[in-house]
A protein has these predicted regions:
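A short Gly-Trp-Pro
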Residues: 4-125
Length: 125
């Protein structure tokens, strides 16, 4: 986010999803985090590794963040073999739609609740 840490993904993203767990909600400041799943060996830190920190979220996940701006960059999951890269940190968005919500929030079946959707910001926004 601040640019202190940079990385590249050297293989196609395998999946995209929403996570509604309390850790992802808190670290994203939103109702969910949108992530891109990739094998961790294909996530290469190209700049600023010394600016990275990490912390254990639970027995199965470790979050990696930027020490300069505190942005969560990715979360190591599935015994550290995969990285859930925060989509908001990517310069190029993968061309695949989210396939799942984990753990699914009660309201996730209809996130818009019938509200209109816009391709551009309306004048009143």
């Amino acid at each position: 986010m601040c640019g202190a840490v940079r990385y590249t993904i050297t293989a196609p993203v395998e999946y995209v999803g929403y996570c509604h767990c309390s850790s992802c909600r808190q670290s994203s400041g939103s109702a969910f985090a949108l992530f891109a799943g990739v094998k961790k060996v294909y996530l290469q830190i190209t700049q600023g590794a010394v600016s990275m920190g990490n912390y254990v979220r639970n027995a199965d996940t470790m979050a990696h963040f930027c020490r300069e701006c505190s942005s969560v960059l990715f979360v190591a999951v599935r015994k550290g073999e995969y990285a859930h890269v925060q989509m908001g940190t990517l310069l190029k968005v993968p061309g695949i739609w989210p396939q799942s919500s984990i753990p699914k929030a009660v309201w996730a079946d209809d996130i818009t609740n019938g509200q209109p959707q816009f391709t551009e910001f309306p004048d009143w926004c």
